[in-house]
Swiss-Prot record:
It holds the Pfam family Ribosomal_L28. This is Large ribosomal subunit protein bL28. PANTHER family: 50S RIBOSOMAL PROTEIN L28, LARGE RIBOSOMAL SUBUNIT PROTEIN BL28A. NCBIfam families: L28 (TIGR00009). The keyword Lipid metabolism does not apply. It comes from Campylobacter jejuni subsp. jejuni serotype O:2 (strain ATCC 700819 / NCTC 11168). One of its GO terms (cellular component) is ribonucleoprotein complex. Keywords: Ribonucleoprotein, Ribosomal protein.
């Protein structure tokens, strides 16, 4: 499935655009996906599309 984080499964959400006149139209909020190379536990590297928030969490966990 497109536009989904391959680790957490985060995907698009639905919300509204709200104008100054308070008119509401549907819109989609897309996750901030980044294509990065991830080193797996067995030592192989793999390209994955992950959300920026997931990337931040992974960097924080690996620094400990």
């Amino acid at each position: 499935m497109a536009r989904v984080c391959q680790i957490t499964g985060k995907g698009p959400m639905v919300g509204n655009n709200v104008s100054h006149a308070n008119n509401k139209t549907k819109r989609r909020f897309l996750p901030n996906l980044r294509t990065v190379r991830v080193t797996l536990e067995d030592g192989t590297t793999r390209k994955m599309r992950i959300a920026a928030s997931t990337l931040r969490t992974l960097k924080k966990q690996n620094s400990k």
